[in-house]
Amino acid sequence: MIPDSLNRKEIRIDPSSATLETPAAELFDSVVYVPLQTIKQSIFSNIDQMEVTRKCYVILDESLNTIFLFTKDGKFYNKIVNTDKVAEGTFKKIGKFVVDEKREEISFLDPHSFYRFYYSFEGKYLRKMPKVISGEDFYHMSTGLDIYLRSANQILYRSNKAFFESNPTVATSNILVLDSLKKIRYGYLPLDTSTVALDDLYGVAQTFYNNHNGRVTLSIPYNYNIYEIDSIGKMSNTYCFVLPAMNSLPNDFMKNPVYKANRVSYLNNNKNAVYSITDFYQGDKLVTFRLVNALDLHNFLLYNLETAELISMIEIMPDHACFKLPMVQRRIYAAANNHFFISALSASTLFSAKEKLRKDKNWEKQLPQHLKKFYKGDQLQNPVLTLLYLKK
């Protein structure tokens, strides 16, 4: 199917013109710091994926092959790890996980087995089910739909070939929507397999973004559009990015056979060319996103849909809104109800900031009690979440 583009909005930006050193108080009503409890059972280092539910933060550290569960005030209460005493619940590897708020379940595909594993929000093993299809990324909607991203290699290898025998027209779709009976409902964004070679395309860490509005936002590499899929699986094209020529891929980059088997080398030779727009979250009149190119810069940007102002998030100036502390480090991990974005900082980053502020005698006195408690610990504590509450 072709996504509906009737209400698509154009975002025309020049990354080099992004405003620097915008005061935090001009963008955020407040910034709340949530230290994630550090005890022996809860220690982790990387946030590779995070989902926010009404009850908890769900955090995956891929290096530990573990999902950690924290309450909304940062208290650790359980984790999902493959040493479960229930033999049936033993998995080999956590792939991407999804949450079902309605059923209060966490599930993930194990790339090294034939199963999808299900756990409760309390971290209790529930069941495992045979995988229906493999994907580079996937998303679950509370209406029962599962949405899969299939990589170019998976399409070219014709993985899950038998699955498509009843519906061959969607076999080259990058995006598949399956209903609760595991039948294909829709296929979107087909790949022209005649112009793409194996290992021809870079991937990205995440495709689907939960904006908590009953729909899921998504973007795929080599495509400057942002899409949404609604509760019944219909896709719409909501935004289209227009970049300067020096930052853009050729218009025929995915169609022209001259680029076949040469796309990686093209990007290595044209390092300013953006090949993906990731981490797209919307908060009322502001959207945040990251431009990905071969330079591998932390190019987090904030765009005002009303004024068209472009702001570098990494350069936002700390002030009284955030206790003069940094707010963003690696990326934006989530958004909640159009009201705030969520990022995270390492403990060492916050201790470095404290060292720079030590001459300000009144600074520490103004900190909330939970941050004062955090600073009584050391730099080896768990990361600290930052909730960036947007100005109305």
What are the functions of these language-model segments?
Residues 239-258, 262, 307-337, 351:
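Conserved blade-ending motifs and adjacent loop-strand segments that build the rim/top face
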